[in-house]
Amino acid sequence: MHEYSIVASLIQMCESHAKEHNAASIAKVCIAVGERSGVDSALVKSAFETFRLDSPLCQNTILEIQSQSVELECRDCGHYFQAQNLTYSTCPQCQSHNVIIAKGKELHLLSLELDIQS
């Protein structure tokens, strides 16, 4: 369940940004989870709901998770495309089998909404 360590790191990163900007709290965290990242979005959500309670800055934080679809790249012609079958894909442009996953393996912090009181 590496999702727990991912969420712990995510909360630490968010707290660091919040403190850097003198935020009173973190209103919203938005992340993107790639379809082939190996991360279970439901477990991330569950872990976040638990761990946020231990953070004074995240007590009422909303977590928004966006799914990032897989995009493949042909290493022969450079064409980017989405495929139905990710275990075996052929470039629709040049019919090459020399393709790699270009997007969809990552987990990104997209945005933070901070409550800043002056």
UniProtKB/Swiss-Prot annotation:
Keyword Zinc: yes
Record note on disruption phenotype: Cells do not produce hydrogenase or urease; addition of Ni(2+) to cell cultures compensates only poorly for this loss of function. Normal amounts of apourease are produced by the cells.
InterPro entries: HypA/HybF (IPR000688)
GO terms of biological process kind: protein maturation; protein modification process
Domain of life from the UniProt record: Bacteria
Keyword hit for Metal-binding: yes
Residues binding Zn(2+), per UniProt: C74, C77, C91, C94
One MF annotation (Gene Ontology) recorded for this entry: nickel cation binding
Binding site for Ni(2+): H2
Alphabetized UniProt keyword annotations: Metal-binding, Nickel, Virulence, Zinc
Any coiled-coil regions, as ranges: none
Function: Involved in the maturation of [NiFe] hydrogenases. Required for nickel insertion into the metal center of the hydrogenase.
NCBIfam families: hypA (TIGR00100), PRK00564.1 (NF001839)
Family: Belongs to the HypA/HybF family.
PANTHER family: HYDROGENASE MATURATION FACTOR HYPA (PTHR34535:SF3)
Identification of the protein by name: Hydrogenase maturation factor HypA
Native organism: Helicobacter hepaticus (strain ATCC 51449 / 3B1)
Gene symbol of the encoding locus: hypA
